[in-house]
């Protein structure tokens, strides 16, 4: 597949429990890994195979070391929050980002999304403008929290899941990209007919779904620095038209 709804079960330890330790032995133990990051168990078939790879143990060891020496974003309980909004079998659209926002209070585990109480970043503002261009009647709250999309089956996934506060791309060499690539590859094999939105060269090089099996949409990155204005992107409309041809419920892109 690659060259590179039901309500999910409530994850363990979400109500103020002491932070569980990271697993260290190889192969990594699924139960310990799940507890450490509050991962929904529905994602086990897609994530657990990565735990047998020694590179994942090395990744977690380096992540743990960074947590001891620098402020890492998002908080550990949000690194895998994308597993808690919908199950793999409910995913309809995959939007690939690069790494989390690096200012405090913004990142919460969903690519491009920010917490509801913080200003909308410029790239996300352009994404929402493109939605409005596709759907002029869409209700937009003025906030940048995309949890509603995630619950509707939009997987908002960064290729790098963590970042040092104030230092963009600072964790890009930890190995998250390999881990995430494996997860997406298994999702694509399990779920033919997904819509992939790949914005910018990074996403398009990192994730390469088979266009014979999936609907692959490419555009420039929504950054204000991109040469092509993202407001002209028609991906949200195109995705829904494709889903409708497969008798799948379209996404309500309102925020």
UniProtKB/Swiss-Prot annotation:
Compartments (UniProt record): Host nucleus
Region (Disordered): 1-20
Active site, UniProt feature: 99 (proton acceptor)
GO molecular function: uracil DNA N-glycosylase activity
EC number: 3.2.2.27
Swiss-Prot/TrEMBL catalytic activity: Hydrolyzes single-stranded DNA or mismatched double-stranded DNA and polynucleotides, releasing free uracil
Top-rank taxon: Viruses
Coarse class of the protein's main subcellular location: host cell
Any GO BP: base-excision repair, AP site formation via deaminated base removal
Protein name listed in UniProt: Uracil-DNA glycosylase
Signal peptide interval: none
Function, in words: Excises uracil residues from the DNA which can arise as a result of misincorporation of dUMP residues by DNA polymerase or deamination of cytosines. Therefore may reduce deleterious uracil incorporation into the viral genome, particularly in terminally differentiated cells which lack DNA repair enzymes.
Family: Belongs to the uracil-DNA glycosylase (UDG) superfamily. UNG family.
Gene Ontology CC terms: host cell nucleus
Keywords of this entry: DNA damage, DNA repair, Host nucleus, Hydrolase
HAMAP family assigned to the protein according to its UniProt record, in alphabetical order: UDG
Enzyme class: hydrolase
Organism: Human herpesvirus 2 (strain HG52) (HHV-2)
Listed SMART domains: UDG, UreE_C
């Amino acid at each position: 597949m690659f060259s590179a709804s039901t309500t999910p079960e409530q994850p363990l330890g979400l109500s103020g429990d002491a932070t569980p330790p990271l697993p260290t032995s190889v192969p990594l133990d699924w139960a310990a890994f799940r507890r450490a990051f509050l991962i929904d168990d529905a994602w086990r078939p897609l994530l657990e195979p990565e735990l047998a790879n020694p590179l994942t143990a090395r990744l977690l060891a380096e992540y743990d070391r960074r947590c001891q020496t620098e402020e890492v974003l998002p908080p550990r309980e949000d690194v895998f929050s994308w597993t808690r909004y919908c199950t793999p079998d409910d995913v309809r659209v995959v939007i690939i980002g690069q790494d989390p926002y690096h200012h405090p209070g913004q990142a919460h585990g969903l690519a491009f999304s920010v917490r509801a109480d913080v200003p909308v970043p410029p790239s996300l503002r352009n994404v929402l403008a493109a939605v409005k261009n596709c759907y002029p009647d869409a209700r937009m709250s003025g906030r940048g929290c995309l949890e509603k999309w995630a619950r509707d089956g939009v997987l908002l996934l960064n290729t790098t899941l963590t970042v040092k506060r104030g230092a963009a791309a600072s964790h890009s060499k930890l190995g998250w990209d390999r881990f995430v690539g494996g997860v997406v590859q298994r999702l694509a094999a399990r779920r033919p007919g997904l819509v992939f939105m790949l914005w910018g060269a990074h996403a398009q090089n990192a994730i390469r779904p088979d266009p014979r099996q999936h609907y692959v949409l490419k555009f420039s990155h929504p950054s204000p620095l991109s040469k092509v204005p993202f407001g002209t992107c028609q991906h949200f409309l195109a995705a829904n038209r494709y889903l409708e041809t497969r008798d799948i419920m379209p996404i309500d892109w309102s925020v």
